[in-house]
Amino acid sequence: MSKIYDWFEERLEIQAIADDITSKYVPPHVNIFYCLGGITLTCFLVQVATGFAMTFYYRPTVTEAFASVQYIMTETNFGWLIRSVHRWSASMMVLMMILHVFRVYLTGGFKKPRELTWVTGVVLAVLTASFGVTGYSLPWDQIGYWAVKIVTGVPEAIPVIGSPLVELLRGSASVGQSTLTRFYSLHTFVLPLLTAVFMLMHFLMIRKQGISGPL
């Protein structure tokens, strides 16, 4: 094992990377509330794992979506547990994100020189809410259908661009297969990719600037 480690160490300088990660200064005022961002990240990773598992059985069509969710819950081994963990971690992610935003705001973590860190955090908050909206529709039950119809109908009130925007969201003039396809694509590909990119930016800036000091 030591020879294998030495081989990688010679090429990648693993020890130097580990020392840099573990030697980062942590201010003495840091408490448990500073862990809320990390908990949000953990919930996101759980979402990715459980969501990926469900894609093997879920069918994004208006005729089969609800039946496929029922199949996951009743027929698939541990499907009920995977979907339940997905739902619970989704709620936990939203809650932890809200508490994290409040903590950062109340402790002044958005002030100079951390404005861009705050901006990426706000973008991540919007993406988190978007996960909730798109994921809520995927079972395509009565609640999901009418939730999508209401949410996608909100932009109708915007002058000039309202109607085209509604059609863009729905994929057609009314809620249907095109809407479900778009929401599924957003929920399983577009939003996770954007979230991963902005999380990386967020963490790199935190790593560079460090944790904000006390008020």
Curated annotation (Swiss-Prot):
Cofactor(s) named in the record: heme b; heme c
Transmembrane segments: 32-52, 90-110, 116-136, 186-206
Described function: Component of the cytochrome b6-f complex, which mediates electron transfer between photosystem II (PSII) and photosystem I (PSI), cyclic electron flow around PSI, and state transitions.
InterPro entries xref list: Cyt_b/b6_N (IPR005797), Cyt_B6_PetB (IPR023530), Cytb/b6-like_sf (IPR027387), Cytochrome_b_N_euk/bac (IPR048259), Di-haem_cyt_TM (IPR016174)
Keywords, sorted A to Z: Chloroplast, Electron transport, Heme, Iron, Membrane, Metal-binding, Photosynthesis, Plastid, Thylakoid, Transmembrane, Transmembrane helix, Transport
Predominant location category: plastid
Family, per entry: Belongs to the cytochrome b family. PetB subfamily.
Pfam families: Cytochrome_B
Name assigned to this protein: Cytochrome b6
Lineage, uppermost ranks: Eukaryota, Viridiplantae, Streptophyta, Embryophyta, Tracheophyta
Binding positions for heme c per the UniProt entry: C35
Annotated GO biological process: photosynthesis; respiratory electron transport chain
Keyword Kinase: no
Originating organism: Morus indica
GO molecular function: electron transporter, transferring electrons within cytochrome b6/f complex of photosystem II activity; metal ion binding; oxidoreductase activity
Further remarks about this protein from its record: Heme 1 (or BH or b566) is high-potential and absorbs at about 566 nm, and heme 2 (or BL or b562) is low-potential and absorbs at about 562 nm.
Membrane topology: Multi-pass membrane protein
Cofactor mode of binding and number, as noted: Binds 2 heme b groups non-covalently with two histidine residues as axial ligands. Binds one heme group covalently by a single cysteine link with no axial amino acid ligand. This heme was named heme ci.
Record-linked PROSITE patterns: CYTB_NTER
Subunit architecture: The 4 large subunits of the cytochrome b6-f complex are cytochrome b6, subunit IV (17 kDa polypeptide, PetD), cytochrome f and the Rieske protein, while the 4 small subunits are PetG, PetL, PetM and PetN. The complex functions as a dimer.
Signal peptide positions (record): none
